[in-house]
């Protein structure tokens, strides 16, 4: 299996739905490049990241949900979308031809219908992906296994309890029980991709290589996420140790070449030092393709094509259909802005979509 998150998605789709991995990737790549050439847009987003729950049971020090209340338009506690509302959006996504939807939050396992949502996506031939802190997975993995979940992403920053709890604000033991639950799920239901994400900061820089060893031993993929300073009044987390960072990144690239379970692409790793040390910005003249394949929905159904600070809301699914939002003038504007490298934004997981399109 290729070491790239979006490549994994299409490889799992081929196993679950009987599609051709090579044909799907080639079709997406050709469609996007043709759309760019003809100043057009694809008929569908390929991947939707959906915040299906605004509440969270962890307190990550770098997360907006942990730093702020999230009121709705009436100034009250935010509205939690019900099952039927979500399934209606799944129907729209299926009609458009969306390939995968990641259920995240907040913490999606705080929902009582997470198994129902997973099954609903599978029935519509949309690959469900669960993005979780793992704490509640110990009590829900059997339900999710029966529902057909085949891709789990768990946030684990470190295997040192003190470092993990400092960054995540929740019990390390509980989170690791979630990882063990995912392993049990794979053992019982088979072919489940387990994928850890670690947010890189100055506090866990030296812990990352140990995480790689753990992932290799358990056939778990590891994605390195960067710490984004957007919205921060002060920055006490960014990596400043140039020598240490270079050593870790160099080793990560060596391990990936040797076949380690590192999901971050070479393109991502090649620019990781630049991002961490040069004011958290993407490389100059970087062309981002995510506007041609990715759509983000928050818990109030606001749609964006990027969480980056320079890319705003493009519409709301309550007021417009998914198709209308994907094709509206704001989306077209931001799509071109991102393609031209004028967003000045982030260096997060969407770069893996870019790597897939550029075949890097």
Question: What is the role of each PLM region?
Answer:
Residues 106, 265-267, 345:
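Short, solvent-exposed turn/loop segments enriched in Gly/Ser/Thr/Pro and often Arg
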Residues 1-44, 282-285, 289, 300-360:
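Flexible mid-to-C-terminal extensions adjoining Fe-S/redox cofactors in radical SAM and related proteins
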Residues 77-81, 167-174, 239-244:
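Alpha-helix N-cap and loop-to-helix initiation/capping positions
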Residues 2-151, 233, 240-241, 359-360:
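Conserved alpha-helical substructure of the radical SAM core
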Residues 55, 59, 63-66, 291, ...:
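Cys/His-rich metal-chelating microdomains
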Residues 83-104, 110-226:
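Radical SAM/AdoMet-radical enzyme domain recognition
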Residues 55, 108, 136, 158-161, ...:
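Short, solvent-exposed loop/turn segments at secondary-structure junctions
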Residues 24, 32-36, 41, 189-193, ...:
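A C-terminal junction/extension of Radical SAM enzymes
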């Amino acid at each position: 299996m290729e070491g790239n998150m979006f490549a994994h998605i299409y490889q799992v789709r081929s196993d679950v739905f009987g599609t051709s991995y090579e044909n799907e990737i080639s079709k997406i790549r050709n469609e996007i490049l043709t759309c760019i050439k003809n100043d057009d847009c694809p008929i569908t987003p390929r991947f939707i990241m959906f915040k299906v729950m605004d509440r969270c049971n962890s307190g990550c020090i770098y997360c907006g949900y942990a730093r702020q209340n999230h009121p709705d338009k009436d100034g009250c506690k935010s509205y939690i979308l019900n099952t039927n509302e979500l399934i209606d959006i799944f129907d729209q996504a299926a009609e458009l031809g969306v390939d995968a939807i990641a259920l995240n939050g907040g913490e999606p396992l705080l929902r009582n219908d997470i198994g129902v949502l997973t099954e609903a996506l599978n029935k519509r031939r949309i690959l469900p992906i669960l993005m979780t802190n793992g704490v509640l997975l110990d009590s829900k993995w059997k339900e999710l296994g029966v529902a057909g979940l085949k891709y789990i992403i768990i946030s684990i920053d470190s295997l040192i309890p003190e470092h993990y709890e400092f960054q995540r604000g929740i019990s390390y033991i509980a989170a690791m029980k979630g990882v063990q639950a995912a392993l049990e799920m794979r053992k019982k239901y088979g072919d489940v991709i387990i994928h850890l994400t670690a947010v890189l900061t100055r506090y866990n820089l030296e812990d990352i290589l140990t995480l790689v060893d753990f992932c290799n031993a358990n056939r778990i993929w590891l994605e390195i996420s960067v710490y984004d300073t957007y919205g921060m009044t002060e920055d006490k987390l960014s990596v400043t140790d140039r020598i240490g960072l270079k050593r870790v990144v160099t080793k990560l690239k060596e391990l990936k070449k040797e076949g380690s379970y590192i999901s971050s692409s070479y393109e991502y790793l090649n620019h990781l030092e630049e991002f961490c040390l040069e004011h958290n910005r993407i490389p100059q003249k970087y062309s981002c393709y995510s506007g041609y394949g990715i759509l983000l929905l928050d818990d109030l159904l606001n749609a964006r094509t990027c969480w980056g600070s320079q890319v705003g809301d493009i519409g709301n699914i309550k007021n417009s259909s998914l198709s209308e939002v994907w094709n509206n003038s704001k989306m077209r504007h931001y799509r071109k802005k991102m393609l031209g490298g004028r967003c000045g934004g982030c260096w997060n997981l969407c770069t893996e979509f870019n790597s897939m399109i550029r075949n890097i």
